[in-house]
């Protein structure tokens, strides 16, 4: 069996100094390793401080968190943002945070992959409890990988050489109004005092299950080791957390109403652009995609992204419920079905438009 020697960065080299084949795909973020290269990459940069201000949504977060806190007093609530999903090789799909996370932090758009919101129950004799609080919200995030660290150029997920200046602990606290902690502290924070102690000294943990499977598995293992051995009961408890969050979003606050109106206006503009594009698209080999592209460009100009993949279904594709390949030809005198919506931050619209296309002549 071949012997491998780990380097300071975790990659393994064979005895002859060559790299394992499966590690070669990561070369761009791991090598070279010399001190002179590190000095070159981390020195003489201009100011990399991101511009930070409180998000408009941050004014509405305390009320949302208070309602959540009152529903689950004395319990630790874990709400992940989710992890990036690989598209191919070392390239990820554009990140979109879980809706529950976005609702309770105000962080929409592409904030913040890997982050976790924890509602930490307060002790009865604490100052927070005396002030009427039942939880303290804590946002666990990755620190900035700026040019003072080697991760600046080695980490393609967080390194600011790769992704530009990003929000870290200080910045996300200013943006959300929520206290932040290093993500490295998360495991210990979640496991603290977890127990099914009959005397009421232990803490139950609930998690939004489907968002981050790896984190959910850790929570399940921790709960089982702490006496919460009924898997069905644990799942049911988690489902109640998700259910409450989903129902809470049914009643929109003023901020959400403004965002919905922005999304509606942007979606209307997108449909206008598609209809303007339609005459030139008729009969073209890629006409469904030409119309799709017209809408998607508005989604990026006026919002954050499309709320879901745009459906442009013409002729025989029109009866298909979720036709998103959009490979067909839009012909004259056929039924054209468009289902599209713009997402602004984390709220989006859904507009279904069935119509015959113009006939020739």
Where are these regions (language model features)?
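Short, basic/aromatic beta-hairpin or loop at an interaction surface
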Residues: 305-316
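Active-site pocket-lining segments that scaffold enzyme catalytic pockets across diverse folds
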Residues: 252, 256-278, 283-299, 308
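Acidic/histidine-enriched ion/cofactor-binding microenvironments in catalytic or ligand-binding pockets
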Residues: 104-111, 120-121, 318-347
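Short, Lys/Arg- and Gly-enriched loop/turn segments at beta-strand edges
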Residues: 87-89, 344-351
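Single conserved hydrophobic/aromatic residue that forms the stacking wall/gate
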Residues: 353-361
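Anionic group-transfer/hydrolysis microenvironments
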Residues: 82, 315, 339-341, 352
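Short acidic loop-to-helix transition motifs that present clustered carboxylates
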Residues: 288-291, 314-319
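A composition/biophysics-driven feature that prefers long, compositionally simple stretches
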Residues: 1-270
């Amino acid at each position: 069996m071949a012997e491998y020697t780990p380097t300071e960065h975790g990659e393994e080299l064979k005895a002859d100094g060559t790299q394992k084949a499966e590690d070669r795909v990561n070369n761009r973020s791991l090598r070279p390793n010399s001190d002179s290269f590190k000095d070159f990459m981390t020195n003489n940069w201009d100011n990399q401080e991101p511009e930070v201000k409180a998000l408009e949504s941050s004014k509405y977060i305390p009320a949302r968190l208070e309602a959540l806190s009152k529903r689950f007093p004395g319990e630790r609530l874990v709400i992940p943002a989710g992890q990036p999903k690989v598209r191919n090789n070392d390239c990820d799909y554009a990140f979109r945070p879980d809706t529950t996370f976005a609702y309770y932090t105000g962080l929409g758009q592409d904030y913040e992959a890997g982050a976790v919101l924890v509602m930490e129950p307060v002790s009865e004799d604490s100052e927070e409890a005396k002030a009427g609080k039942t939880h303290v919200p804590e946002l666990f995030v990755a620190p900035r990988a700026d040019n003072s660290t080697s991760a600046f150029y080695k980490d393609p997920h967080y390194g600011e050489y790769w992704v530009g200046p990003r929000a870290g602990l200080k910045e996300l606290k200013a943006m959300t109004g929520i206290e932040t902690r290093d993500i490295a502290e998360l495991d210990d924070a979640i496991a603290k005092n977890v127990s099914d102690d009959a005397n009421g000294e232990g803490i139950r943990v609930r998690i939004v299950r489907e968002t981050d499977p790896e984190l959910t598995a850790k929570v399940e293992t921790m709960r089982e080791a702490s006496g919460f051995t009924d898997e069905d009961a644990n799942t049911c408890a988690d489902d109640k957390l998700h259910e409450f969050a989903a129902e809470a979003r049914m009643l929109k606050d003023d901020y959400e109403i403004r965002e919905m109106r922005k999304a509606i206006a942007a979606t209307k503009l997108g449909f206008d652009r598609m209809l303007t594009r339609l005459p030139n698209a008729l009969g073209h080999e890629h006409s469904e995609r030409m119309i799709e592209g017209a809408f998607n460009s508005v989604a990026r100009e006026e919002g954050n992204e499309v709320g879901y993949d745009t459906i442009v279904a013409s002729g025989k594709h029109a009866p298909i419920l979720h036709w998103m390949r959009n490979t067909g030809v839009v012909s004259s005198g056929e039924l054209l079905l468009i289902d599209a919506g713009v997402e602004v931050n984390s709220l989006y619209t859904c507009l279904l438009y069935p119509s015959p296309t113009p006939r020739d002549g």
